[in-house]
């Protein structure tokens, strides 16, 4: 078994790389502890794979480097990368089934992208108001 495992998670334009290694339960996002992440809802979302892992989370350290996108996209990308890394590190099919049952999007990148702007409009769907007079 190698010293560490790297996994990637994506959401919209956010890309997260999670590095998992044997450790003492430290979880860093861009070098800062995950507990210091400012938005509580997103912090809880990022901690879901760790909560599912339970007590075994004290055996590992996860360092996530995330860039691009906004807060929510980065949180989802981080969550996906962490879940994938945890599954590959422990190689436990029961754990994978538990994560998949909890939320499949933790293991599958969301492929939806922003729809491009169309001519004669302000965005993908909105159009200029039509005047008859």
Curated annotation (Swiss-Prot):
- InterPro entries membership: Ribosomal_Su5_D2-typ_SF (IPR020568), Ribosomal_uS9 (IPR000754), Ribosomal_uS9_archaeal (IPR019958), Ribosomal_uS9_CS (IPR020574), Ribsml_uS5_D2-typ_fold_subgr (IPR014721)
Any one GO MF annotation of this record: RNA binding
Q: By its UniProt entry, which SUPFAM superfamilies does this protein fall under?
A: Ribosomal protein S5 domain 2-like (SSF54211)
The protein's superkingdom reads Archaea
For biological process, the GO terms are: maturation of SSU-rRNA from tricistronic rRNA transcript (SSU-rRNA, 5.8S rRNA, LSU-rRNA); translation
Q: Which PROSITE patterns match?
A: RIBOSOMAL_S9
Residue span of the signal peptide, if any?
A: none
Which keywords belong to this entry? Ribonucleoprotein, Ribosomal protein
Please provide an example of a Pfam family that matches this protein in its UniProt record. Ribosomal_S9
Question: Which GO cellular component terms, listed alphabetically, does the Swiss-Prot or TrEMBL entry include?
Answer: cytosolic small ribosomal subunit
Tell me its family.
Belongs to the universal ribosomal protein uS9 family.
What the entry lists under NCBIfam families is as follows: PRK00474.1 (NF001749), uS9_arch (TIGR03627)
Q: What is this protein called?
A: Small ribosomal subunit protein uS9
């Amino acid at each position: 078994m190698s010293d560490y495992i790297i996994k990637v998670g994506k959401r919209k334009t956010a890309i997260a790389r999670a590095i998992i290694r044997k450790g003492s339960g430290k979880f860093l996002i861009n070098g800062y502890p995950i507990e210091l992440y400012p938005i509580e809802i997103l912090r809880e979302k990022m901690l879901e794979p760790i909560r599912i892992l339970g007590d075994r989370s004290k055996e590992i350290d996860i360092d996530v480097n995330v860039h691009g996108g906004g807060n929510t996209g980065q949180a989802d990308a981080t969550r996906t990368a962490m879940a994938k890394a945890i599954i590959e590190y422990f190689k436990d099919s029961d754990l994978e089934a538990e994560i998949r049952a909890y939320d499949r999007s933790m293991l599958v990148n969301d492929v939806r992208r922003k729809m491009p702007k169309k001519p004669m409009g302000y965005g993908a769907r909105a159009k200029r108001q039509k005047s008859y007079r």
